[in-house]
């Protein structure tokens, strides 16, 4: 079964646990998701069954939009409410102070990813190392914050809506916000609203050809050549310039790359549902 859709992950389950629920619900064996949500987080999770898991890397998932609540004064090594180690009782902040912090954290930001994250450290997920207490470091990275709106402030909880680039961490954004205020913060709630154009629509199966953000190309020879994965050259196609292209046929899809006057198959002969 090949399918792709947006699911709504509840809180309290890891993304893998939720995926197993969906596999049982739909009676499938092969499934995957794009963009891990932590157990305390909820919301939009792109899920695919069968061969459609191969298309994740070709989806445009920027910007990612979240609604989150930060707890000002709470310390947590994981940056969320699952590992709180200390809570400081603080006086409420003036709206002007919060607005100054918000405005200073737009555009490209350098940050250190959370140690409790799915980052790969020599073949092991960072969160697994963090849970064992093993010492390690993560490299500084960059994310882009396109917009951020403060929705409400009921001290010590500040709720905001943020739009950021793929790969960015809302927990890291909250840590940067806390530094502007001079105190630790952690997230008490996190919900992913959308990834690019992908939003939850009651698990409606999506048309793979409509959601792939790739230009189309056309092979001028026999379709059997594509099905057999034969070596091809740019002159065999209507468009010869470098790029990644979708080839759509009645029963299957292929993705090719034209680069330096050569053709390579990114994906070949994926059956259409």
From Swiss-Prot:
Keyword tRNA processing in record: yes
Coiled coil start-end: none
EC number per UniProt: 5.4.99.25
Protein's GO biological process: mRNA pseudouridine synthesis; tRNA pseudouridine synthesis
GO MF terms held by the record: RNA binding; tRNA pseudouridine(55) synthase activity
PANTHER family: PSEUDOURIDYLATE SYNTHASE TRUB1, TRNA-PSEUDOURIDINE SYNTHASE
InterPro entries given in the database record: PsdUridine_synth_cat_dom_sf (IPR020103), PsdUridine_synth_N (IPR002501), tRNA_psdUridine_synth_TruB (IPR014780)
Family under the similarity heading: Belongs to the pseudouridine synthase TruB family. Type 1 subfamily.
Stated role: Responsible for synthesis of pseudouridine from uracil-55 in the psi GC loop of transfer RNAs.
Matches recorded under Pfam families: TruB_N (PF01509)
Active site: 38
Keywords annotated in UniProt: Isomerase, tRNA processing
Superkingdom in the source lineage: Bacteria
Protein's name according to its UniProt entry: tRNA pseudouridine synthase B
NCBIfam families, A to Z: TruB
Isomerase is among the record's keywords: yes
